[in-house]
Amino acid sequence: MKTFSPKPQDITRDWYVVDAEDKILGRLAAQIAHRLRGKHKPEFAPHVDNGDFIVVVNCEKIAVTGKKLSDKKYYRYSGYVGGLREQTLANVLATKPERALINAVKGMLPRNRLGRAMLKKLKVYAGSEHPHQAQNPQALELKY
């Protein structure tokens, strides 16, 4: 029996909506990355992008444990001397709450062309409204 290798025309992608209210940031990101890669499907192959589309709403109400709000820092470097900028998680959640979840999921995906394609299937919104009603996303209850 030959090993099954999924073809691009055989891939079916579903749309799911996840409510991030009172969910822990890292645990939520791990489960989203698992679904974006397609590891929950029996036809998973590491060289094929066969994951689903994930729409995350209420990202501004995400939870973190411990002292991460003040201790966790995000760094950006402009490339110029003195251009290293740092923000705490509290500042990121106050200004752009979507970025905290996107950065967490991005760190759990492969760092190559395939990982960038997987990240494009993640749609994150701070409020409870999203513009993807036409795709009929199913509500997805994650484990924790």
From Swiss-Prot:
GO terms for biological process: negative regulation of translation; translation. Keywords: Ribonucleoprotein, Ribosomal protein. InterPro entries: Ribosomal_uL13, Ribosomal_uL13_bac-type, Ribosomal_uL13_CS, Ribosomal_uL13_sf. The keyword Protein biosynthesis does not apply. Part of the 50S ribosomal subunit. This protein is one of the early assembly proteins of the 50S ribosomal subunit, although it is not seen to bind rRNA by itself. It is important during the early stages of 50S assembly. This is Large ribosomal subunit protein uL13. It comes from Oleidesulfovibrio alaskensis (strain ATCC BAA-1058 / DSM 17464 / G20).
